[in-house]
Regions:
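Mg2+-dependent prenyl diphosphate-binding active-site environment of isoprenoid biosynthetic enzymes
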Residues: 2-208
Length: 208
């Protein structure tokens, strides 16, 4: 992988700033269940890859057409549109490879459940589906339920995953994992509200 020309734009998309709030939530939730941080590292890395992929694609001219991300030039502005598409797609697939690796302190059953969950929440029923709704709603009147549904998918689903995945590692039962997932969704919606407020009131250079 180090020989790939895509490594540099991939690193740029992941490491270049950002609050890393999703990883923080994973670690903090894990602490509540006395889970050693090393058991959560691969999940955090995967989440940051998924989140960064979604931002890279979200900024593309065919999507939201944003030139600034995290106070710096968006990936497509720095490396070109085609490279940004490939870097984002590579981060998406890298996330699943990270979870499937040996010696990441997860059992095979946990890996399978986490991979299935992440695929569900990052694809057409999650992040990608939410982005499609966002594009379809552009310049159209939409009611509050449509907006919430879009935000649940586009932003909330990855927060759902963060808490649910910790529940998997903690060997919680189905009901407990669903409760964690529901809490994650609420956190995601609150985060999106705060983010939207910053987009309107904050400095574009600082907020990105």
């Amino acid at each position: 992988q180090k020989k790939s020309l895509l490594v540099t734009p991939m690193k740029y998309g992941v490491i270049s700033g950002g609050k890393k709030i999703r990883s923080t939530i994973i670690f903090d939730t894990g602490r509540l269940f006395n889970i050693k941080y090393k058991k959560l590292l691969s999940i955090c890395a995967a989440v940051e890859c998924i989140h960064s992929y979604s931002l890279i694609h979200d900024d593309l001219p065919c999507m939201d057409n944003d030139s600034i991300r995290r106070g710096k030039p968006a990936t497509h502005k720095k490396f070109g549109e085609a490279t940004a598409v490939l870097a984002g797609s590579s981060l998406l697939t890298l996330a699943f490879e990270i979870i499937s690796r040996e010696n990441n302190y997860l059992t095979l059953k946990q890996k399978n459940e986490i991979i299935s969950l992440l695929a569900n929440f990052s694809g057409h029923t999650g992040i990608a589906g939410g982005q499609e709704l966002d594009l379809k709603f552009e310049n159209k009147n939409k009611n509050i339920n449509q907006i919430i549904d879009m935000q649940r998918k586009k932003t909330g689903k990855l927060f759902n995953f963060c808490l649910h995945a910790v529940g998997i590692v903690a060997n919680k039962n189905k009901k407990e994992k669903k409760l964690l997932e529901s809490l994650g969704e609420d956190i995601g919606l609150l985060f999106q509200l705060a983010d939207d407020f910053l987009d309107r009131k904050g400095s574009k250079k600082l907020v990105g």
